[in-house]
């Protein structure tokens, strides 16, 4: 297989974890005979420094012409007072790619379960599906004076149906349960959300549907996370709840994410930020970035075996006791990546009977 991947290293630790992504991709090429054209483009704060814009037109054009996009990290205090903010580029990139579904799998490795703030961390295995294009972030009018500020929350039927359908399709391949999170006891947009969700559910009779109000959901994520399979919710609620869920793994450096469009390339990135305090120190945890690569291989390219090989190698390295500093170890970004690549090679040799 031959695919073109745009690599947006971005800011902070982004360039370091992007090298880890490239490392496992090169190993996949060598072990399975694929070829990936990796194209580096400027994005975020570094793009502001070079071009004045966080998302140069050249970068967006390259992303649109690709088969998938990998993003390292974006932002940092260096650009706090700048006219253009790096994070603005991420919103523009999502809009330009037309991605509507943000997908965050939340699982806990047995080797690092003790780092989770929850006692029964081994029961955690769910996915948060967040709607990305509608809701309060993108609705108008918006206005502010010294005395009053107004935001608008709007959702259209087709936006709800699209994201909920995606969640049901995903759940049908997992444990066959969808939890829809809303505030239907108060918000008109949530009442429509619930109505449309129930209509979509009729097309998936083998998938269980439950509704939970967002405040109760925030509590249940901590009290009983094992009850969840696929969570689907609107933009603002998803933004907050997915961040809450991410800490259950014990480190932000562990979890990947994907953002999908109806057609065209998807965007894959770790959920962690740019971590400017450790940037350039070879301390960043590359697991979330490598898992984002695994998601890309499986979800965009159909290379499930290759994606699983990365996941299995990561698990094996963790079980061997090798960890980066954020999860209680002494491995560097580089040494942990090399260990995963070596494990991939060894597992492939075992699979082929040496």
Curated annotation (Swiss-Prot):
Taxonomic lineage: Bacteria, Bacillati, Bacillota, Bacilli, Bacillales
Binding, Mg(2+): 215, 239, 243
Positions that bind NAD(+): 76-87, 273-285
Any GO BP annotation: L-leucine biosynthetic process
SUPFAM superfamilies reported in the protein's UniProt record: Isocitrate/Isopropylmalate dehydrogenase-like
Assembly and binders: Homodimer.
Entry note: cofactor: Binds 1 Mg(2+) or Mn(2+) ion per subunit.
Catalytic activity entry: (2R,3S)-3-isopropylmalate + NAD(+) = 4-methyl-2-oxopentanoate + CO2 + NADH
Protein's name according to its UniProt entry: 3-isopropylmalate dehydrogenase
Site note Important for catalysis, residues: 137, 183
Keywords assigned by UniProt, alphabetized: Amino-acid biosynthesis, Branched-chain amino acid biosynthesis, Cytoplasm, Leucine biosynthesis, Magnesium, Manganese, Metal-binding, NAD, Oxidoreductase
Top EC class for this record: oxidoreductase
Keyword field contains Lipid metabolism: no
InterPro entries reported in the protein's UniProt record: IsoCit/isopropylmalate_DH_CS (IPR019818), IsoPropMal-DH-like_dom (IPR024084), Isopropylmalate_DH (IPR004429)
EC code(s) of this entry: 1.1.1.85
Main function: Catalyzes the oxidation of 3-carboxy-2-hydroxy-4-methylpentanoate (3-isopropylmalate) to 3-carboxy-4-methyl-2-oxopentanoate. The product decarboxylates to 4-methyl-2 oxopentanoate.
Localization: Cytoplasm
Gene Ontology MF: a single term: 3-isopropylmalate dehydrogenase activity
Annotated pathway: Amino-acid biosynthesis; L-leucine biosynthesis; L-leucine from 3-methyl-2-oxobutanoate: step 3/4
Binding site for substrate: 94, 104, 130, 215
Cofactors required: Mg(2+); Mn(2+)
Annotated Gene Ontology cellular component terms: cytosol
Entry's family note: Belongs to the isocitrate and isopropylmalate dehydrogenases family. LeuB type 1 subfamily.
Pfam families per UniProt: Iso_dh
């Amino acid at each position: 297989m031959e695919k073109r991947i745009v690599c947006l290293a971005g800011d902070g630790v982004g360039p370091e974890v992007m090298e880890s992504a490239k490392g496992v991709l090169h190993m996949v090429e060598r072990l399975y005979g694929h070829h990936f054209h990796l194209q580096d483009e400027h994005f975020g704060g570094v793009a502001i420094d070079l071009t004045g814009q966080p998302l140069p037109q050249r970068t967006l054009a390259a992303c649109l012409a690709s088969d998938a996009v990998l993003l390292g990290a974006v932002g940092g205090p260096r650009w706090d007072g700048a006219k253009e903010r790096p994070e603005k580029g991420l919103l523009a990139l999502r809009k330009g790619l037309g991605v509507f579904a943000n997908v965050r799998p939340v699982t806990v490795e047995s080797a690092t379960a003790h780092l989770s703030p929850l006692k029964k961390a081994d029961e955690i295995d769910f996915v948060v599906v967040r709607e990305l294009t509608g809701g309060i972030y993108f609705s108008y009018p918006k206005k502010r004076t010294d005395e009053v500020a107004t935001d608008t929350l709007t959702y259209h039927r087709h936006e709800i149906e699209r994201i909920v359908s995606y969640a049901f399709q995903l759940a049908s391949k997992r444990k066959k349960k969808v939890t829809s999170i809303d505030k239907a006891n108060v918000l008109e947009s949530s009442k429509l959300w619930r109505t449309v969700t129930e209509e979509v559910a009729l097309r998936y009779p083998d998938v269980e549907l439950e509704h939970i109000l967002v405040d109760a959901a925030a509590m249940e994520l901590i009290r009983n996370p094992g009850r969840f399979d696929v969570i689907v919710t609107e933009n603002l609620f998803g933004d907050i709840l997915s961040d809450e869920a991410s800490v259950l793994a014990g480190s932000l450096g562990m979890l990947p994410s994907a953002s999908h469009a109806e057609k065209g390339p998807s965007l894959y990135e770790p959920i962690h930020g740019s971590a400017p305090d450790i940037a350039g120190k070879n301390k960043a945890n590359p697991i979330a970035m490598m898992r984002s690569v695994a998601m890309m291989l499986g979800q965009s390219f159909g290379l499930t075996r290759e994606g699983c090989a990365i996941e299995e190698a990561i698990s094996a390295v963790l079980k061997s006791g090798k960890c980066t500093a954020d999860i209680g170890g002494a491995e560097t970004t580089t040494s942990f990546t090399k260990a995963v690549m070596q494990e991939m090679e060894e597992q492939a040799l075992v699979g082929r009977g040496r």
